[in-house]
């Protein structure tokens, strides 16, 4: 018996049901890699960031997330080179879906009990996504804006429902606006730290502030 189509599990009807000591024997999620491309690129190398944003409250299967990841990665490698971008899948499939297997052979009515004891066995995992939640993000150089939009557009076809493509006003994967970012780094209010930044607040010991600005 094959996998049941994901359209059967598209809507968020039940409460979140994660893997636990009570919910055992869950098959591994299809998606294993959530970051692709040049993920160790410094924060100042990739200022542009594009998001794919969900427009529906639904469930996305781990198979769909994997298919979208492969699709976006393949296009970005072809158009920007394998070191010209960083893709991050922002959803993790933690919700376990169940199946109550039914026999379809002759004489099945003697072997099975129909809807008696119908709590199913774990079949796979899905990610629950809300309206306005980011599904996937890509950061790259400013000249690759059109390629980011096209990669996310192609990845959209792997998902049910509606999604929007949004070019962020923030710098890369940080939460700081792109037009203020370089000034804040120059003033040492932001310290680059891998693909993110550390924010140094105005509070704290004066000696620490003097040491930073000396």
From Swiss-Prot:
It is found in: Cytoplasm. Keywords: Citrullination, Cytoplasm, Developmental protein, Isopeptide bond, Ribonucleoprotein, Ribosomal protein, Ubl conjugation. There is a cross-link at residue 175 (Glycyl lysine isopeptide (Lys-Gly) (interchain with G-Cter in SUMO2)). Citrullinated by PADI4. Ufmylated by UFL1. Component of the large ribosomal subunit. Plays a role in the formation of actively translating ribosomes. May play a role in the embryonic brain development. Component of the large ribosomal subunit. Mature ribosomes consist of a small (40S) and a large (60S) subunit. The 40S subunit contains about 33 different proteins and 1 molecule of RNA (18S). The 60S subunit contains about 49 different proteins and 3 molecules of RNA (28S, 5.8S and 5S). This is Large ribosomal subunit protein uL16. It comes from Pongo abelii (Sumatran orangutan). The lineage of its organism: Eukaryota, Metazoa, Chordata, Craniata, Vertebrata.
């Amino acid at each position: 018996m094959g996998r049941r189509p994901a359209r059967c599990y598209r809507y968020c009807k039940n409460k979140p049901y994660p893997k636990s000591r009570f919910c055992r024997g869950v098959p591994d999620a299809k998606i294993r890699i959530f970051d692709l491309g040049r993920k160790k690129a410094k924060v100042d190398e990739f200022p542009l960031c594009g998001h794919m944003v969900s427009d529906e409250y639904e469930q996305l299967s781990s198979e769909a997330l994997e298919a979208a990841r492969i699709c976006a990665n393949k296009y970005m490698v072809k158009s920007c080179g394998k070191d010209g971008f960083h893709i991050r899948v922002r959803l993790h499939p933690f919700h376990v879906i169940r199946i109550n297997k039914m026999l379809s052979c002759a004489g099945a009515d003697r072997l099975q009990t129909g809807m008696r004891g119908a709590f199913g066995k774990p079949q796979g995992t899905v990610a629950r996504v809300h309206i306005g939640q980011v599904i996937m993000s890509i950061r790259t150089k400013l000249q690759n804006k059109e390629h980011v939009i096209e990669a996310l557009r192609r990845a959209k076809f792997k998902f049910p429902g509606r999604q929007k493509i949004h070019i962020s006003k923030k710098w890369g994967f940080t939460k700081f606006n792109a037009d203020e970012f370089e000034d804040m780094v120059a003033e040492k209010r932001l310290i680059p730290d891998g693909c993110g930044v550390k924010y140094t607040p105005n509070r704290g010991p004066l000696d620490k502030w003097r040491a930073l600005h000396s």
